[in-house]
Amino acid sequence: MSSPRAEESPLNVLVTGGSGASGVAVARALNHAGCRVFTVGSDRQRIEAAAQQAGDGVTPLVCDLARLDDVRRLREDVSAAAGPVDAVIHLVGGWRGATGIPDQSDEDWDFLHQGAVTTLRNVSRVFFDDIAASANGRFAMVSSTALDQPAAGVASYVAAKAAAEAWTMAMADGFRKADGGQAAAVVLVVKALVDEGLRRRNPERSFPGATDVEELAAAVVRLFKAPADELNGARLRLAGQPPQ
């Protein structure tokens, strides 16, 4: 696969939340597409293992994305090693649920808010100018179809995701106003994500409607092949598996 950028130097792409199956798949696909990939996680052993799975040339980095100063140091490290970041694929999240509204716990809310909102705010504030200045700047987050019809049992989850989506749409407005208008902020929407490991551990389940992490990865690569003005502010639904 050819590089999404036709220029001599490859795109510098940061995959945040890179330790899981989706992070591995996205980093691998971007690496194969010719990007210079930095995959970020909070646990050194896990992110190094993920980078190894993603392939030669993928660089693992450790950062607590909930801490703004740590994210600023992350930018300094990447910039020193490879120059400005062109794109961030934000895969940090998490899920918590309850039975209804009364038992939505503060602990679950704090967990979801930190994972879905705080990390995204920090990463976007620190890397916004770099992405906006790139000729192929992209920012993408993954959201959920649960926002279409919010259910009481997942009130905290959908509220956190909605906040993250709103912030991303505000980024899109910022990119429109930036000089050049070459950057795009996008929300990728799935019902759920599934990978081969999850299927092997749960052979009795069919995961109807879930999107394979390889399809997510392919969708991320496609973001660099479409014009920014067509993508910016888009909420793109990814296909899931049909019921079996």
Task: Locate predicted features.
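Conserved glycine-rich cofactor-binding loop
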Residues: 19-20
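Conserved glycine-rich Rossmann-like NAD(P)H-binding loop of the short-chain dehydrogenase/reductase
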Residues: 33-49
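Rossmann-fold cofactor-recognition segment
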Residues: 54-69
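Conserved mid-core segment of classical short-chain dehydrogenase/reductases
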Residues: 72, 93-110, 153-156
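Catalytic loop of short-chain dehydrogenase/reductase
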Residues: 132-179
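C-terminal helical subdomain
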Residues: 182-189, 195-196, 203-244
